[in-house]
Amino acid sequence: MNETNEWSRLSRRRQQKKKRKGRITFILIFLFAIIAIVGTYYASKINHTINLITQGVGNRTEQEANEIIKNAKPINVLLLGIDNGAYGRTEEDGRSDTMLLLTINPTQKKSQLLSIPRDTYTEIVGAKIYDKLNHAYAYGKATMVINSVEKLFDTAIDFYVQINMEGLIEFVDAVGGIEVTSPLTFNYENRTFIEGKTELIDGESALRFARMRYDDPDGDYGRQKRQRIVIEKLVEKLMSFSSITNFEQLMNAVSKNVKTDVPIGQVMALKNTYSPALTSENLSQAFMDERQLLLKNNEGQEVYYSYATDEVLLKTSNSIRKLLEKSAVKTYPLLQQREDLYYLTIP
């Protein structure tokens, strides 16, 4: 890809970001919906599934986490969409291709969803290197992503929720398929989608719809947009109990493809206390104003990264701190000393 085409694509992405409206965040609501749709009738099966998906990964003890939720404190939740399997990668070299930081203040009934560019050039905490942020998962799974995001924004992550994209097939089939309207015409792996055409698709087609990247003029942003469409349609189906055609299949898909460190006994309390702040009226979208950075990697290849100045990081950190009811900081504590590493920037 030449520099002109890359710059044109990046410009389109910036313009489209400004047009996006606030929505109910999809990954956390997806987890909540799975639990809420079935009520107490399937309580034992749900509890078994929750036991399978909850894992102690973050930097909070279970007692601390319980107190946070019990006292309705403002929280940060890191939402990760992992590409294990779905894009030809293994568990060892997977990437967190979708990273969202959700800050929720249940008392104010306000929340902010920060989209973190996957190519953000930053320190990978624990690996002693600088790289794209989405590579942190390959180096040290969710723990390293959490630690790297905490340092990048100078804020604590209270909980995380992770969904593997390879589970899309099972999720979609379990609800009897979903209706999607393609934003563009394309063919991927012998499956054709027509711009503006609404159709009912199964799990295999949903995965093809969500994973195509290189034929989209908007590149990775276009792929993320289609992933949002699929997940939002899944949520719509999950909110209607009658839409679930195979409950056992759904629970199996959840246990294999969803992970979180929310304490088992607090999942429903988290939903009941914090979800009112997640409506479209109460949720604001936030984006980082980043420059593009061209570096040579360890193999001497030229690679594009997203680069946030300390001023941008300060502004972003303070927007998070405000919702957490913490004092703003005037100078950013993170000195990354990256300026001597690059030889070309696109302002």
Summary of predicted features, one role per range:
Residues 55, 64-65, 129, 262-347:
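C-terminal solvent-exposed extensions
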Residues 96-98, 130, 142-150, 165-169, ...:
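Extracytoplasmic/secreted envelope proteins and their assembly/folding machinery
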Residues 72, 173-250:
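Flexible, polar/acidic helix-loop-strand segments at domain edges
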Residues 72-75, 94-99, 108-116, 128, ...:
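Extracytoplasmic
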Residues 2-8, 16-109, 290, 304:
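Entry/capping segment at the start of metal-dependent catalytic domains
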Residues 112-140, 184, 191-198:
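Flexible, solvent-exposed short loops/turns enriched in glycine
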Residues 134-193, 241, 261-263:
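Amphipathic, coiled-coil-like alpha-helical scaffolding segments used for oligomerization/assembly
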Residues 86-90, 130-139, 154-159, 214-221, ...:
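Second-shell loop/turn segments in exported
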